[in-house]
């Protein structure tokens, strides 16, 4: 049953974050508060904190608790890993943006309308890189060793503390860069789902590649002016990529678990 942990946790994330997108902020706030308390424990008499030791202890405590809960049962692992997949939260936020655009709020300023569409579509890329692609790969890597929950939550802790801890920022950015490269490959493979030829798209990063696939990037790849329907296409394409990745990782894990 451990093979079902990855797809089940991703599905549960949709059930959690679609109706309650603000849970992402609550999760990150709680992780930052926990990290701050641990930093105080590692603060010496001179007022200097050993940030690296504090970060190591924070990650060990966080991943250790996740690993213990996940080892109870695969269903427990799926439940405990669901909050790590924060990407579905951006779907609710983008839906509210689309409703605003469709209401005619930008009827008098079409340039702002286009900028809002382009920005909303581009924001899907980092959200799915850090909130779906990276934790999904880490969960898959750790699953054969019963460390999937630990690695996924360790990454969530690193991302939450990146703003206040330089070491956490460096590690999380390194993981995110690798995940972004994988996500770009998935976008190219799946761009046919929105009727685009992969050979006619460009862009170095995930944001520019996504806009190019949608046909709303600046340059030769642009096929039309940005409209609110592009937000739906961007959401569908990103979700399609993650479903494909979940299937591929599950097939890879099949002989290992």
Enumerate the language-model features and the residues they cover.
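Hydrophobic N-terminal alpha-helices or hydrophobic patches in metabolic proteins across all domains
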Residues: 1-257
């Amino acid at each position: 049953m451990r093979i079902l942990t990855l797809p089940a946790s991703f599905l549960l994330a949709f059930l959690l974050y679609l109706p309650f997108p603000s849970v992402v902020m609550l999760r990150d706030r709680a992780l930052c508060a926990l990290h701050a308390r641990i930093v105080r424990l590692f603060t010496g008499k001179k007022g200097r904190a050993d940030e690296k030791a504090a970060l190591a202890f924070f990650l060990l405590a966080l991943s250790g608790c996740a690993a213990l809960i996940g080892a109870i049962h695969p269903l427990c692992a799926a439940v405990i890993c669901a909050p790590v997949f924060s990407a579905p939260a951006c779907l609710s936020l983008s839906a509210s943006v689309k409703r605003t655009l469709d209401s005619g709020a930008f009827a008098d300023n079409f340039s702002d309308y286009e900028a809002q569409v382009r920005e909303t579509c581009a924001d899907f890329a980092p959200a799915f890189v850090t909130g779906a692609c990276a934790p999904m790969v880490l969960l898959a890597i750790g699953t054969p060793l019963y460390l999937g929950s630990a690695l996924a939550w360790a990454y969530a802790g690193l991302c939450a503390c990146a703003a206040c801890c330089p070491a956490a920022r460096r590690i999380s950015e390194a993981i995110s860069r690798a995940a972004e490269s994988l996500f770009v490959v998935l976008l190219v493979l799946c761009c046919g789902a929105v009727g685009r030829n992969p050979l006619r798209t460009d862009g170095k990063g995930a944001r520019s590649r996504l806009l190019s696939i949608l046909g709303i990037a600046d340059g030769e790849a642009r096929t039309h002016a940005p409209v609110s329907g592009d937000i739906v296409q961007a959401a569908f394409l990103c979700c399609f990529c993650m479903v494909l990745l979940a299937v591929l990782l599950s097939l890879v894990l099949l002989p290992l678990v």
